[in-house]
Amino acid sequence: MTTSVIVAGARTPIGKLMGSLKDFSASELGAIAIKGALEKANVPASLVEYVIMGQVLTAGAGQMPARQAAVAAGIGWDVPALTINKMCLSGIDAIALADQLIRAREFDVVVAGGQESMTKAPHLLMNSRSGYKYGDVTVLDHMAYDGLHDVFTDQPMGALTEQRNDVDMFTRSEQDEYAAASHQKAAAAWKDGVFADEVIPVNIPQRTGDPLQFTEDEGIRANTTAAALAGLKPAFRGDGTITAGSASQISDGAAAVVVMNQEKAQELGLTWLAEIGAHGVVAGPDSTLQSQPANAINKALDREGISVDQLDVVEINEAFAAVALASIRELGLNPQIVNVNGGAIAVGHPLGMSGTRITLHAALQLARRGSGVGVAALCGAGGQGDALILRAG
């Protein structure tokens, strides 16, 4: 049976909303990540047969953002590209689709990833084409309306998560402690050089002189403590437990990986980070987020024929601290193997990028170990979840 492997990957540092990457479009960030991934894989652009990039906020981005990124990265005009939107799952779904296409023998070399500029998301004047006869007009925030608002319950996803917390009973202190640890772990990982294998610098043009190199995720606060987070006001409900500190950050960034038929990689004399195993794709029973990563992981484990206690590396997107806590509890995971270098609460959550980021990070951890099994998983808007099993190469 055909096996696909992640040969290498790269990501930009993640910028805060209106931060260092504010002047870059999502496709420009995607091009940087794709170039970096190909360079790290030692694969020429001429070998790429298909490009898949996730992006959620596409209003105003121009036609075919994935193709924009591919062409800007030096990939040929004869290489097709696909932009996918599965909300927060887009970046991992791009990799899963690449794996499926390779297993189906459609392609041997696929670039997959995700890109997002939440800063560049425009405001929308709905119904303007048909005109307004009288009265005030509402302008919608594309980021909030199409990215962060649950369409099924007509409320922010944070408010929906807060409602589910009433059932899960995660305390404010549990969430604050988890969030503080995310920052502390991410800061320590940067200090120890852990992210050096995946992050490539972004050159930011200046009005005069040489470009400024943006090299590190700018949302991480090394001195964050649970005590400090305890002073923040609830973000979604007066008596709520979720704050800006225990939710993922609104961010800009891109990531990409080179997915290849294992036989092709061997033919080219390449090594790889990890083999891609089973997929877990789930949805429902409603639009809540907390159980989706655990459900997706369970489905992937079942398809892979292994149990949760055989996992060595676990990366779960920290949309909210409550999501990660629910995943740990529902799966019975050892917290010591989950998001060991922090997560989206600290580094940020560019919507279309995050699935690729955590998959790449899990693959790199397995490569450094030289053995083992890992999983990357996320929840997604509308009450969906995706997971990918990875095995060390």
From Swiss-Prot:
Keyword Acyltransferase: yes
Organismal lineage: Bacteria, Bacillati, Actinomycetota, Actinomycetes, Mycobacteriales
Keywords: Acyltransferase, Transferase
Species of origin: Mycobacterium tuberculosis (strain ATCC 25618 / H37Rv)
The protein's Enzyme Commission number: 2.3.1.9
Superkingdom per UniProt: Bacteria
NCBIfam families in UniProt: AcCoA-C-Actrans (TIGR01930)
Record-linked SUPFAM superfamilies: Thiolase-like
Gene behind this protein: fadA4
Molecular-function GO terms, alphabetical: acetyl-CoA C-acetyltransferase activity
GO cellular component, one term: plasma membrane
Catalytic activity: 2 acetyl-CoA = acetoacetyl-CoA + CoA
Family matches, as InterPro entries: Thiolase, Thiolase-like, Thiolase_acyl_enz_int_AS, Thiolase_AS, Thiolase_C, Thiolase_CS, Thiolase_N
Coiled coil: none
Propeptide: 2
Protein name, as recorded: Probable acetyl-CoA acetyltransferase
Catalytic residues (UniProt): C88, H349, C379
Enzyme class (EC, first level): transferase
Similarity section: Belongs to the thiolase-like superfamily. Thiolase family.
CDD domains the record matches: thiolase
